[in-house]
Design a protein with these regions (language model features):
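Hydrophobic transmembrane alpha-helices and immediately adjacent juxtamembrane helices
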Residues: 1-292
């Protein structure tokens, strides 16, 4: 933690900034993070540069990735498996779920290796370590904005062709839902990042785990499909990503299963994951250079 000090000592003995170790379990200086907002912006720009450096299509992959995935979902789950889509066009159904899920998955995957991939930088200069994962989720937020714009273009096409889709009042909740998804991704990501300093296997397992998590979420199937399997439906509802996905579909397609229990549970889980993640991150950052 850094703090500004005003002293009357001679210039050769004066310090403008003193770095002291953190002592509390939840010792996060929000004012300090705000003072380093320019650094966060620089990290966001760097993330884009590193991600698409030496690629032929560059940032076009932001659009191509979810678009290709949606087409595959539509062919495999909609065509071959003939899964229901609650009466809305399958392409939009899968794109809606995939857009929300991709945002969450990017937040988790991009923050999961914060300590390991930035150990050299952390060992050379001081700055709030939490700026790194924050910059990663902000990068994911920008990607989501671009993908959401693409989704709206396809939505407009299907709306114009009389597909029966419509926006509902739930659309007003979308900014808050996406904020929740971002905070959940940040919380889970920094938990994994903190644990990978000692258990490197997690860095490999997190990608696989996120993929499995997707199939436990109503991305390729509607929650209503599980009405005849009450126990399985309850298990899926215990997934904190179920409520955000269903709300997004309800908001933009007019179909979905939104419950008070699902909303409250998802919010509580997100808050718990974020608090636990920040506490763990704060404790690990003191000693991670000895284990990385």
């Amino acid at each position: 933690m850094a703090e500004n000090l005003q002293t009357t000592r001679p210039a050769e003995e004066s310090w403008t900034t003193v770095i002291r170790p953190k002592t509390g379990w939840f010792d996060i200086d929000l004012n300090e993070l705000w003072r380093y907002r320019d650094l966060i912006t620089m990290f966001v720009k760097r993330n884009f540069t590193v991600l698409y450096k030496q690629t032929i299509l560059g940032p076009a992959w932001i659009i191509l990735n979810p678009l290709i995935t949606t087409i595959i979902f539509n062919v495999v789950f909609g065509g071959m498996a003939n899964m229901p889509t609650d009466g809305v066009p399958g392409f939009l159904f899968y794109m809606a779920g995939n857009t929300v899920w991709t945002f969450f998955a990017n937040c988790v995957n991009n923050t999961a290796n914060t300590f390991v991939t930035n150990s050299q930088v952390f060992g050379k200069v001081y700055f709030p370590r939490l700026t790194m994962p924050i910059s990663q989720v902000l990068t994911s937020l920008i990607n989501f904005g671009i993908q959401a714009a693409m989704y709206l273009i396809f939505w407009g096409y299907f709306f114009a062709t009389g597909s029966g889709i419509t926006f509902t009042l739930w659309a007003l909740a979308i900014p808050f839902v996406m904020l929740e998804v971002m905070l959940l991704g940040l919380g889970v990501g920094i938990i994994v990042s903190s644990l990978t300093t000692k258990y490197r296997d997690l860095a490999i397992a997190v990608g696989f785990g996120v993929q499995l998590w997707m199939y436990a979420s109503p991305v390729v199937y509607p929650l209503s499909m599980l009405d005849n399997s009450p126990r399985l439906k309850v298990l899926v509802q215990l997934n904190p990503m179920t409520s955000p996905i269903e709300i997004f579909r309800m908001a933009t397609l007019g179909t979905g299963t939104v419950t008070v229990f699902g909303i409250v549970y998802s919010l509580i889980f997100t808050a718990a994951a974020l608090v636990f993640g920040v506490v763990l991150f704060s404790r690990i950052e003191k000693t991670f250079m000895d284990t990385v």
